[in-house]
């Protein structure tokens, strides 16, 4: 993984967003790059948190906050989107049955 020179963002807190976090290796690599470039304390968000407790802990230890949606049950699932997905599926089913 490579990153451009982020010097103009030094001291600011970056927000990393990933669609799926499983082993956490991509996020951890990105966090290391941000640390080397002396950015502020990062926040991490993931749509689907499939990671093991160990992988999540390794991310949590390197960030201000690690947050995922509730599409997969996990300790970090703080963004509730299951009702939105359910409502969308019901609406789509009702529309297709007409």
Regions from the PLM with identified roles:
Residues 1-98:
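PRPP-associated nucleotide enzymes
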């Amino acid at each position: 993984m490579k990153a451009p020179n982020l010097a103009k963002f030094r001291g600011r807190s970056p927000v990393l967003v990933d669609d799926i976090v499983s082993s956490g290796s991509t996020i951890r690599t990105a966090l290391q790059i941000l640390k080397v470039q002396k950015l502020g304390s990062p926040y991490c968000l993931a749509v689907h948190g499939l990671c093991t407790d160990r992988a999540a802990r390794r991310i949590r230890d390197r960030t201000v906050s690690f947050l995922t949606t509730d599409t997969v049950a996990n300790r970090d699932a703080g963004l509730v989107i299951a009702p939105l997905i359910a409502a969308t599926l019901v609406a789509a089913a009702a529309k297709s049955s007409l």
